[in-house]
Amino acid sequence: MCIRDRAQTLLRAMTLALGIERDFFDSRFNDPVSVLRLIHYPPRHTASSAEQQGAGAHTDYGCITLLYQDAAGGLQVRNVKGQWIDAPPIDGSFVVNLGDMMARWSNDRYLSTPHRVISPLGVDRYSMPFFAEPHPDTRIECLPGCQDAEHPAKYPVTTCAEFLLSRFADTYAYRRELEQA
């Protein structure tokens, strides 16, 4: 089973949990803009450099992320109490993070996962996140059953491309400011 099939299986499970049709996401993920990244995090050289993060705290922009991480560790997720906890690697498994687009789609019934990477002490870290995203023209609007009179839609309708591009623009706004200075 390829990684895209695993993502599709997870999306189908999520629709069942929300009480909507099982194949809701199938057509929306034809010709997707999914991305696989290969990431190297250099090691920390001293224990006191724990603040030197490999990746600062963030949430993923898209729907779901399937993350393969090597045995080095370093991934942390923020729990509901706001504490950072280790997400240790488990051989043969993937970490699943929900992203901001899925939070919008589900009207925050599913929340995006805040996470960060603390570079391991003395060893390189490698990870391979697969960001499962729909077709760029897919409308991102509140899913059926995720809104009612007491819980109206929280977000305006957008498309996958518009949403991702706006998030990238926000993330890299500092570059525009530097260029204008």
Question: PLM features: what roles do these ranges have?
Answer:
Residues 4-181:
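C-terminal flanking tails of non-heme Fe-dependent oxygenases
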